[in-house]
Curated annotation (Swiss-Prot):
The gene is yhaN. It is found in: Cell membrane. Residues 176-236, 373-467, 536-570, 647-789 form a coiled coil. One of its GO terms (cellular component) is plasma membrane. SUPFAM superfamilies: P-loop containing nucleoside triphosphate hydrolases. This is Uncharacterized protein YhaN. Disulfide bonds: none annotated. It comes from the Bacteria. Its main location: membrane.
Length: 963
């Protein structure tokens, strides 16, 4: 056999698919999974279209344009890999590409598929769950027609062919119709016959001829009738001769039956079978009754041992209530632990706050005013106090600065006053200078030198100030940075520099004073410089005195600002002191707001502490009440040494134990009751079977079992004789009553004599009939001559022509009836030969599908409906099967049809959710059958939307379609 396997599909445009490629696995069973509207039916139609051409009715042409069609790639053992490309524009185009690069036309597909078209493929290889769900409604004729025509011509061929033949037959003839062709031709023939009779009546002498002819025809009919009667007598005599031995045997058997005793016929028809059946039921039931009595005694012992604690069971509701409320008890414990932790934390925070506030009594804080108005007044008072304190600090700094500046100004005035020359010294210098000017007026170069020396000294003094200032700056910087060694080094360097520069100044001063004694030019210049410096010092003194007056005025203004501050800020200090007294705060007033905030927090913690203490007491009370309720349910010796959870667990365990005891007791009581009912039922059945056996003995007129068997033997002999007599009577009933009466009233020799007489009479009648037929033939010739002379001949011709037309139309109608009869004969042959073979193959599939529960499929002999036989011998009609089993039956028949009708070609199966109603076991078995069916390379494509069906296959076998 050759098997075609689809490798892949490439869809150009087909239905909802556009430019899609689907690759099939090498597994013979391939699953195409997708939800509703995912394209499963579209893919099935695409495969059929690629193999057999596009459908003419239900088309899948693209709505948005594009190439309608695609490519199907398949593998064939003989042709190798084939690519079937089919597209449709104005006309359908088909190309078949081989793996050798050859391009073939559609004839290769017809050869490959061996004449299988789309309808035959859908009838054999493609089916779904709705195909034959009502299979139980089909009888032998219906399913035979369906399977035959679906296998030969397609599923719809039977109805179309039958309808077409019926229409053509009714177009030609209907028994009571007017319009059909044969009905009209017969009506025309009838009218011509009437006209012919009228014309014949007008012919003279014609009627006499006809009368003579009718007389001969009547004699001929009478002779033929007598001949038939004679033949009947002969047949009756022959039948009597055949039945004469049977009558003799019947008489002998009746005599033998009459010799049997009268009670032999009273024995029940199936007495031995009934006795065996009753005894076969009686013995096991007696054994069952004895076993039940032993079981009854054992159950009664077990019941007496089981004594449940009724008092504890009465408390089951309370224990269940406490068990249900145990989570509340645990919750109370957890809440209590959390509250105690919070209480410890709150107490610690309260103690820390009191310690920080330097207080010991926490109740003082409860009376503290924490209103918003009080807090606002406190904030205002503290804010004013802080502002006053900051203002005083600023005034202190200003006062200190003004005082320092005043002292500096006084020192500067004193320094400037000390730098001015006394009047005597100034006068001496002025006199010396005037004398020098008078005597030394020509020493200009010396004067220039003195000016340069003076300039150098000024530059040296500026440099000295710069170095000292920089040194002091570095000393202060290193002191701030706490780097004492660099600071000390810079200090020592400054001291050395100052000493060296001082000696240089002293040396210069001495050099300057030396010319004064000599009244040198340099000395004279120094005198002028000294007088000029004295004038400048006087001017500087005036400036310092003016600055001193300004500093004194600023000092007075600071003192006035102190007095104004004392007048304005006194109420703020008073208000702050009041708040400090009210709050018991003795520290710096600037920290009063922080202390107040801390007091509020501590007050909240104190309140929280009191609330937590109250809540802890409430929870302890709830837990104590719950513990007391649980303790009341426990025995006295256990109530003190067990936790609540263990106590509840023990109570629940005890309840469960007692309930289990009570349950076991009830079950045993139920078993006892059921056992009593069984014993009563068995006793009644045993009594019934004993009564039936007694009735059976009474019916046979037997005293005991031995007598019953003796009578049974006599009855069996009588039955055999009666059966022989019945067989003889059945053979005699096959003949006519006249034959039996004739055989009974005559001997065998008398019957043979009568047979000889009737045979001679038959020969005489045969000769007479031949003579009459010759005479009638001569009269018919004369009649034809008369009819040929006038109108009668024309009408006769028309009548004969019309008869020919009627014959032609009747032949057409008869040929249609013959075709219908041929089809019926073909169906009958298919039902008798092919259909049993098909059902045998279907049974081979049906057995593994049902796990061997059903063995055989056949048709009922009464109504030709489908019957199946269970493995226990029970026979079921199709309508008595479950839906799943009925679908298994349908699946087996479809598989058998494919196997028996596929010829030499194996095309892929397409199953559309055919097993949706199967459970897991049925699905597993049908998958095994599918794999067995796929042996030899047959490909099976299973389309489904169900998850559990998909999960039964390997992932490599599944193609997913997206909705």
């Amino acid at each position: 056999m050759t098997a075609l396997r689809i490798i892949s599909l490439h869809i150009y445009q087909y239905g909802k698919f556009s430019n899609r490629t689907f690759d099939f696995s090498a597994s013979p069973v391939q699953v195409i999974y997708g939800l509703n509207e995912a394209g499963k039916t579209t893919m099935m139609s695409f495969i059929e279209s690629m193999l057999f051409g596009f459908p003419k009715t239900k088309k899948y042409e693209p709505k948005t344009g594009g190439v309608y069609g695609g490519v199907l790639e398949a593998e064939h053992p003989e042709y190798g890999v084939l690519k079937i490309e089919r597209t449709k524009g104005t006309a359908e185009k088909l190309s078949v590409y081989t793996e050798k690069g050859e391009v073939k036309q559609g004839d290769v597909l017809k050869q490959l598929f061996q004449g299988t078209d789309r309808s035959l493929y859908k009838a054999i290889y493609s089916f779904d769950v709705f195909g034959l769900q009502e299979i139980h409604a089909f009888n032998r004729d219906k399913i035979g027609e369906f399977l035959l025509f679906s296998s030969l011509f397609g599923a719809e061929a039977v109805s179309k062919l039958d309808s077409r033949l019926t229409k053509e037959s009714e177009r030609l003839y209907k028994p009571n119709g007017r319009n059909p062709q044969l009905n009209q031709e017969l009506e025309t023939l009838k009218q011509l016959a009437v006209k012919l009779k009228q014309a014949e009546a007008e012919e003279a002498g014609y009627h006499q001829l006809l009368e003579e002819k009718r007389t001969l025809e009547a004699r001929l009919a009478a002779a033929e009738t007598e001949l038939k009667e004679t033949a009947g007598h002969i047949r009756m005599i022959e039948g009597a001769i055949e039945r004469k031995p049977l009558l003799n045997e019947k008489a002998t058997l009746e005599q033998v039956i009459a010799e049997f005793p009268e009670h032999a016929g009273q024995f029940p028809a199936d007495g031995l079978h009934q006795l065996e059946k009753y005894e076969s039921h009686l013995h096991p039931k007696s054994a069952q009754l004895e076993a039940l009595r032993v079981k009854m005694a054992e159950l009664d012992k077990q019941r007496q041992k089981l004594i449940p604690d009724k008092e504890l069971l009465a408390k089951e509701t309370l224990i269940q209530e406490l068990s249900a409320a145990f989570h509340m008890y645990q919750s109370w414990g957890e809440q209590l632990a959390a509250i105690q932790a919070q209480l410890r934390q709150t107490s610690a925070q309260t103690a820390a706050g009191l310690e920080q506030l330097n207080k010991t009594d926490e109740n003082e804080l409860l009376n503290m005013n924490t209103s918003y108005d009080y807090e606002w007044q406190l904030q205002q008072a503290v804010q004013q106090y802080v502002q006053a304190r900051d203002r005083k600090r600023q005034l202190d700094e200003t006062f200190e600065l003004a005082r320092q500046e005043l002292e500096d100004a006084e020192k500067a005035v004193r320094a400037a006053s000390s730098a001015i020359l006394e009047n005597s010294q100034r006068k001496d210098k002025e006199a010396a200078l005037r004398a020098y000017d008078e005597t030394q007026g020509q020493h200009q170069e010396q004067a220039k030198l003195r000016e340069q020396l003076t300039f150098f000294e000024r530059q040296q003094a500026k440099q000295k100030k710069t170095v000292i200032a920089a040194g002091m700056l570095f000393i202060v910087l290193f002191s701030l940075l706490q780097q004492w060694i660099p600071a000390i080094s810079f200090g020592a360097a400054l001291i050395v520099y100052w000493l060296v520069s001082g000696k240089s100044s002293s040396r210069n001063s001495r050099e300057t004073r030396q010319p004064m004694t000599d009244i040198s030019p340099a000395e004279a210049e120094m005198l002028r410089e000294a007088l000029w410096e004295d004038d400048r010092n006087k001017q500087h003194l005036l400036t310092q005195r003016a600055a001193l007056q300004q500093k004194e005025a600023a000092y007075e203004r600071v003192i006035q600002q102190f007095e104004q501050w004392e007048a304005e800020m006194a109420p703020s200090f008073t208000q702050v002191e009041r708040f400090m007294n009210e709050l018991g705060f003795k520290e710096d007033p600037s920290f009063l707001l922080d202390a107040y905030s801390l007091m509020k927090d501590v007050k909240k913690e104190v309140k929280k502490k009191h609330e937590l203490t109250i809540e802890a007491g409430r929870l302890k009370k709830h837990r104590r009440t719950f513990e007391e309720r649980v303790s009341m349910l426990l025995p006295v010796n256990q109530s003190q040494d067990i936790s609540i959870s263990d106590a509840l667990h023990t109570l629940r365990k005890n309840i469960e134990r007692e309930k289990e005891i009570e349950k076991q007791k009830k079950e045993i009581e139920t078993d006892i009751h059921y056992t009593k009912e069984q014993m009563l039922e068995l006793e009644q059945e045993i009594q019934y079977f004993h009564a039936q056996i007694e009735q059976l003995f009474a019916a046979a007129a037997a005293k005991d079992r031995d007598a019953f068997f003796a009578i049974a033997a006599i009855s069996r002999q009588l039955k055999d004789t009666e059966n022989k007599l019945h067989h003889v009577n059945a053979q005699l009933q096959g003949g006519y009553p006249e034959e039996l009466e004739l055989a009974d009233s005559n001997t065998l020799s008398e019957l043979k004599d009568k047979q000889f007489v009737e045979n001679e009479r038959k020969e005489r009648l045969t000769e007479e009939i031949e003579q009459l037929r010759s005479q009638i033939a001569l009269l018919s010739v004369k009649q034809e001559q008369l009819e040929a002379s006038g109108m009668v001949s024309d009408l006769k011709l028309q009548t004969e022509m019309q008869k020919e037309r009627v014959k032609e139309t009747a032949k057409k109608w008869a040929s249609i009836q013959m075709v219908k009869q041929v089809i019926r004969n073909k169906l009958e042959r298919h039902k008798k030969i092919e259909l049993p073979r098909l059902l045998e193959t279907a049974g081979e599939f049906f057995r593994p599908l049902t796990d061997g529960n059903y063995q055989t499929i056949y048709f009922s002999e009464t109504d030709d409906s489908i019957m199946v036989m269970h493995r226990d011998g029970t026979v079921y009609h199709a309508e008595e099967l479950s839906q799943g089993t009925c679908e298994q039956l349908y699946t087996a028949i479809r598989f058998a049809l494919a196997v028996t009708r596929q010829g030499e070609s194996k095309l892929p199966f397409q199953l559309d959710d055919s097993f949706v109603h199967f459970d897991q076991e049925r699905l597993k078995r049908v998958l095994h059958v599918l794999y067995d069916l796929s042996e030899g390379g047959r490909q099976i494509l299973y389309f489904t939307c169900h998850e559990h069906v998909k999960d039964a296959f390997h992932s490599s076998q599944i193609i997913h379609l997206v909705s």
